[in-house]
């Protein structure tokens, strides 16, 4: 597998490893919106690490180089 595919697989399995995948609430767990926000923040940090400083967020979980970001903004 390629590195990017491995990272995506890891991201898909991460909620299961954290215990958020079974859907059962346990006293003291974070509420779902807070957990989702934390997971999205983690994904954005990971994307920035992969793409480096050229990263411009151009969609949900999508990181584009600056020249692609300008094209994306023009069509949205």
Swiss-Prot record:
Family note: Belongs to the conotoxin Q superfamily.
Domain notes: The cysteine framework is XVI (C-C-CC).
Keywords: Cleavage on pair of basic residues, Disulfide bond, Secreted, Signal, Toxin
Propeptide: 20-48, 73-76
Location of the protein in the cell: Secreted
Species whose genome carries this gene: Conus flavidus (Yellow Pacific cone)
GO molecular function: toxin activity
Tissue expression pattern: Expressed by the venom duct.
Protein name: Conotoxin Fla16d
């Amino acid at each position: 597998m390629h590195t990017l595919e491995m990272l995506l697989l890891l991201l898909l399995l991460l909620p299961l490893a954290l215990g958020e995948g079974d859907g059962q609430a346990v006293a003291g767990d974070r509420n779902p919106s807070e957990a989702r926000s934390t997971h999205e923040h983690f994904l954005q940090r990971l994307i920035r690490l992969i793409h480096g400083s050229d990263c411009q967020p151009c969609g949900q979980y999508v990181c584009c180089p600056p020249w692609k970001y300008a094209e994306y903004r023009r069509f949205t």
